[in-house]
Amino acid sequence: MRIGVELNGVLRNTLGKIEQTYQKYMIEKMEGVDDKNSFKYELKLPITSLELSNHLMFENEGDLYSFLYEEFPMEIFGHSQSTEYTTFNDLNEQYVNLRDSHDLLIVSDEIGKSKPSSLFFLSKFGCQLEKIKFYSNSTINSMWNEIDVLLTANPTLLLNHPEDKLVIKYETIYNQEINTIHKIKKIKELEEIIKQIATC
């Protein structure tokens, strides 16, 4: 079986780092500026969805894109924390246990400078998986073609996946309302779920 493990939300706490970076570089930078014509940056917490424009106030979508992928991609995507303290120790151990009978790969929705930043993140944490598949909205079908099972926290992927593919939900605050057959709370639970799926 080919198993895709999503980077954002499953292995990397991307939303936490986005929140921290926005607070530091957008809100704190503008504190004390009394220009009536300047834009008021505002952070609406908690971040309970992947619709970032609902939580991070920018003048327009272009500014949000620039913040994520042009101005701070290494800060956000390269220097994020892992989702759990032992994420990569657990993932690497399961990779070693499963690699003789299953193919594990990292999949991630990335564009522009977030790709090299994500590679830095994976190397920083010592990820041993040999294959990484970057995709975007326009190339998402190529990601689905490479896997049979996807471990994801992304609500869109949990709800909209090809019928011949299985999804495993990694539980987060922004996907708790979505019901799936397979779900985990910790990355170390993945191996047991894969064994259950393989015997079905």
Predicted regions and their residues:
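Short acidic-hydrophobic, aromatic-tinged amphipathic segments that line or gate anion-handling sites
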Residues: I132-S136, I181-E189
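Short amphipathic alpha-helix with an adjacent loop that forms part of the alpha/beta core around
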Residues: N141-W144, L190-C200
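Short, well-ordered alpha-helix to beta-strand connector turns
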Residues: S101-H102, L129-E130, N145-D148, D164, ...
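Short, acidic loop-to-helix structural element flanking the phosphoryl-transfer center
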Residues: F58-I106, G112-P116
